[in-house]
Amino acid sequence: MKYYGMYLAALLAILLAGCGESLEDTYKDYSGEGMSIRYTGRPTNITATPGWERVLVEWTNSVDPLISQLKVVWRYDEEADSVLLPAGTTTYSIETINGQPLGDRSFEIILTSVGSDGSESLATTVYGRPYTTQHEEVLAYNRLISTIYKIHDHVVLTFLDWQEGINAAHLTYTKKDGTLGYTELTPELVAQKYYLMEDELDNSKPITVYRTAKLPTCVDEIEFEPMEFDNTRVFNSDFQEDLRRQYGFDEIPEQWIEQQKVLYLDGISYNTLIDLLNFPNLNKVVMGSRRYFPESEADDAEYAQNAVLDPISSNFALEVLNKLNGLTVERYNKHYPQLQAAEFFQEMGATKEPKVKLIDLTGHTFRMSPADIRGFDSHLNHLTDGDPATFWEPRRTNEANQYQLSIDLGEKKAMKGVRIVQRKWENAQEHMVAPTKVRVLLSEDGVNWGYPTYLEETPIGAANGEVCYVDFAATFAARHVMLIVSSGYYFDLNFTSLAEISIY
């Protein structure tokens, strides 16, 4: 009898162990009278994994033998949808809500087991949000192509970075002969940053980029919406501002772009010359021809040499235009030394001042605001004495200042611009206060003023003894001329200086 009891206890332990999962997943409660109430076993280990425009729900089923179905409910605010699945199902892909796409929303997902008598298990709730084109992680991916430049039948691409997770990318386009063109984009090609496509294209048709990616938390491969590139031209802000200085364009006309065969680059500094690729018929670039300073100053890299900050993209643009259009470059002095000189570069040497007719300022002197304090002479008369060795220099102060230099010509006179001569600095460190921008205003009565230039503030060169011509947008008639310059900062002092101001 003792052994029989031991065997019975062991058998009971084995049975209980075998039914362990069922006991965990089958819930019982007791009424006040001790009657047990049995609940349907509920699923466990539920996960909601985001996919591309869907949410994948997975779970582990209860071993409750009375389960006949599984119920999945998903809702967002007042919208709700559901599905009944056969017992034993362990996964479901939620792709729509009431027949409509899920959209970029986070859904409450409720899973229950349904018994053969229609009773439901206790609910388990998880939350899931699909990946869509509006998901912030999807939006964080760039379009791979930064800019497309179209030059006759050719296309130049500039690239952004190949981001982690991108699986594949390619371009489609229409070839010159009307057939469909295809170019695969690879990490190696994109790393080049700049690329002249081999195919000749029909550039009246769009170019489309296709991309796919795989995010670590997404069960699907992401298929981005195809992106079309049209014929819209894109300019960097500094290049566009320089064209506005020269020509007054708020928006650069397409017809004007198409007509340009020669461009003059005199900007003190450009980020890049890649914008030259926007000009399909460009065959000559003239660099630094409108800066005039003594030849002895040409080696001054800080004040006498215009610069380009990204020589790699700039060299690429010049080489492509030389290859496609036979572009030549005329470079004066030693401007843009960062560029790699090529066979199509022509070194032109020093510049010569243009011949202009100066208005006679004999007997006229500039007035300054703020005026000199009593006992101090800034030598305003030096601005019109015709001697570049003399100069005007206001009192040095602890505060930054703007100086208004105005002159009354006595009567209205026709004028096309002002000529400014920079001071020749003996102290190289003081050179940093030389004006690099100027505002010019004209008036007929000395009360109402207007800008005759395309820009309110025009950049000027600051080399030792440099002669700067500020051309007006047209010929104006005025009696009063005003120039506004700002002080520079030298150690603890603020001041500036000029040698000559003339009007032509």
Q: What label would you give each PLM region?
A:
Residues 258-272, 278-356:
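Concave beta-strand-loop units of leucine-rich repeat
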Residues 301-303, 400-401, 429-504:
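Trp- and acidic/polar-enriched beta-sheet ligand-binding modules for extracellular glycan
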Residues 21-154, 231-241, 245, 475:
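Acidic/polar, low-complexity intrinsically disordered N-terminal segments immediately downstream
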Residues 15-18:
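C-terminal motif of bacterial Sec signal peptides marking the signal peptidase cleavage site
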Residues 61-81, 160-183, 434-436:
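Solvent-exposed loop/turn segments flanking beta-strands in beta-repeat/beta-sandwich domains
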Residues 235-242, 255, 344-412, 421-433, ...:
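Disordered, acidic Ser/Thr/Pro-rich linker "stalks" and the adjacent N-terminal cap
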Residues 97-124, 194-222:
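Beta-strand-rich modules
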Residues 53-57, 153-157, 403-405, 414-416:
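Structural beta-strand segments of beta-rich domains
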